[in-house]
Swiss-Prot record:
Belongs to the TraT lipoprotein family. Residues 1-22 form the signal peptide. A lipid is attached at C23 (S-diacylglycerol cysteine). It comes from Escherichia coli. GO terms for cellular component: cell outer membrane. It holds the Pfam family TraT. This is TraT complement resistance protein. It is found in: Cell outer membrane. A lipid is attached at C23 (N-palmitoyl cysteine). InterPro entries: TraT_complement-R.
Length: 245
């Protein structure tokens, strides 16, 4: 009879810990099952209304990811707004220059949140389950094994369900032709050795107003792969760039 009671207790502990340890993974899988995309711009750019609809594009990528489809998507998005793409910067009314600085996997959670809801949570749950059911010396060892085994199962479940966020950071410069003469003062501090700087200044006169902003696009989904995130990140950037015009 006593043996049956211990067996039932260990079975109950195992079931409870398995359920609790899998809650975090299951919750993440449900909440993040659909791809969510968000794009933000650091600064608003206001362009003067103009009947001139020619645009020169210069799209660069200095990240370590392949973004080879970006140029074509930006071109199409701009054309869909009624603008003509030209290969001549001199004849274009607008210049759009973009550089993808970073396209990488980033976790939406803070570091502490990741630890407390990930592996740390599973191990803590295992120890808690073992402590509660270790009600006498004869069963404590066996129940400890059950609790730790359940915790390891929970860790495996958390490892299989990962909340993934890919973020693309792009710097944008828009140049707009104007009939006025625009004077630009350039100042650059160049590092000299380990303790010195050389300051260079120059002044130039042109016919363009220049505006700069940064666009941050994020794609979030459980177990997201970059191959799935890439096209939507490119689409979001192309849409944002075209909407500046």
């Amino acid at each position: 009879m006593k043996h049956n009671v211990k067996l039932m207790a260990m079975t109950a502990v195992l079931s409870s810990v398995l359920v609790l340890s899998g809650c975090g993974a299951m919750s993440t899988a449900i909440k993040k099952r659909n791809l969510e995309v968000k794009t933000q711009m650091s600064e608003t750019i206001w362009l003067e209304p103009s009947s001139q609809k020619t645009v020169y594009l210069q799209i660069k990528n200095t990240s370590d990811k392949d973004m080879s489809g970006l140029q074509a998507k930006v071109t199409k998005a701009v054309q869909d707004k009624g603008y003509t793409i030209t290969s001549s910067p001199d004849s274009a009314h607008y210049w759009i220059q973009a550089n993808v600085l970073k396209a990488d996997k980033m976790d939406l959670r803070t570091a502490q949140g990741f630890l407390s809801q990930g592996y740390e949570g599973a191990i803590a749950g295992a120890a808690l389950g073992a402590g509660i059911t270790g009600y006498n010396s004869s069963s404590a060892g066996a129940t400890l094994g059950v609790g730790l085994a359940a915790g390891l199962v929970g860790m495996a479940a958390d490892a299989m369900v990962e909340d993934i966020n890919y973020t693309m950071v792009t710097d944008i410069q828009i140049s707009e032709k104007t009939t006025a003469s625009v004077q630009t003062d350039n100042v650059a501090a160049l590092k000299q050795g380990t303790s010195g700087y050389k300051v260079q200044t120059s002044t130039q006169t042109g016919n363009q107003h220049k505006y700069q902003t940064r666009i941050v696009s994020s794609a979030n989904k459980v177990n997201l792969k970059f191959e799935e995130a890439k096209p939507v990140l490119e689409d979001q950037l192309a849409k944002s760039v075209a909407n500046i015009l």
